[in-house]
From Swiss-Prot:
Residues 13-44 are annotated as: Disordered. This is Cell number regulator 1. Keywords: Membrane, Transmembrane, Transmembrane helix. Disulfide bonds: none annotated. It holds the Pfam family PLAC8. Belongs to the cornifelin family. The keyword Transmembrane applies. Expressed in roots, coleoptiles, stalks and silks. Detected in leaves, apical meristems, immature ears and pericarps. Highest expression in coleoptiles and silks. Acts as a negative regulator of cell number. It comes from Zea mays. InterPro entries: PLAC_motif_containing. GO terms for biological process: negative regulation of cell population proliferation. It comes from the Eukaryota. Residues 27-37 have a biased composition (Low complexity).
Amino acid sequence: MYPSAPPDAYNKFSAGAPPTAPPPPAAYHQQQQQHGANMDTSRPGGGLRKWSTGLFHCMDDPGNCLITCLCPCVTFGQVADIVDKGTCPCIASGLVYGLICASTGMGCLYSCLYRSKLRAEYDLDEGECPDILVHCCCEHLALCQEYRELKNRGFDLGIGWEANMDRQRRGVAGGGAVMGAPPAIPLGMIR
């Protein structure tokens, strides 16, 4: 149906040398380290992950938005408790944040450290603005975003780190279901 091409037709368009295969992943990772790249290219998918919600999506959780607007130290304490893996309780972190805000008005300098820790823990992309700018310009929005990120990752920020870990242990021990007392079986009409 179609005319056949002459045998040398392909050769006149080729560059001459066959293309080389890309280096294997291990060699590529070593090359990146030699050039000073700070991204881990050996991770599947490579690159950083996006936040589960945007910075301005605070109305995705209106309750948290209201609490953060009225008393940001509560949201900060909840986020810090999870990010620090329970080493500093929610009340202590919130109190320190509140004191820094009240005495200097620069709580954003303290809270941006926790945003950086959260991003490092979950390989989250920093975006166009550094953490310090996000917290200094949009403190309440940043706290709400961090809260939603942890919530979307399965944490219940209202119960703290220890209770979340206990809940996770019970869930794993029960094959995915939370173990508890067996359900009561109604006996019906028995004589």
